[in-house]
């Protein structure tokens, strides 16, 4: 059984978010939370919040035991880019791309759900 949580349009670049997601992928939920609390990156609190939401979804929607849950999938896709301009010398301007992320975390208890024929 799986439960999922998604945070959309987070104002942190996906490349930076993926650094932290790589640390928790495949880990036990409790271990992943401990790692996130000790990781000194701007995306850590946001990812922790998404993970807690996935655990709450698992417990509330599917009656799963949160002690047995494992982070099955954790990925960050690119969201909409905010385009800004920085003034430069001699009247020119440079483009600045402020990137956003869609963060998805899927937790699983390792048991397969019965498929209907």
UniProtKB/Swiss-Prot annotation:
Matching entries from Pfam families are given as: Ribosomal_L22 (PF00237)
Gene name, please? Answer: rplV
Swiss-Prot/TrEMBL keywords: Ribonucleoprotein, Ribosomal protein, RNA-binding, rRNA-binding
GO BP, sorted A to Z? translation
- GO CC, any one term: cytosolic large ribosomal subunit
Task: Please give the family membership noted in the entry.
Answer: Belongs to the universal ribosomal protein uL22 family.
For this chain, one GO molecular function annotation is:
rRNA binding
Functional summary from the UniProt entry:
This protein binds specifically to 23S rRNA; its binding is stimulated by other ribosomal proteins, e.g. L4, L17, and L20. It is important during the early stages of 50S assembly. It makes multiple contacts with different domains of the 23S rRNA in the assembled 50S subunit and ribosome.
Protein name as catalogued = Large ribosomal subunit protein uL22
Q: How does it assemble?
A: Part of the 50S ribosomal subunit.
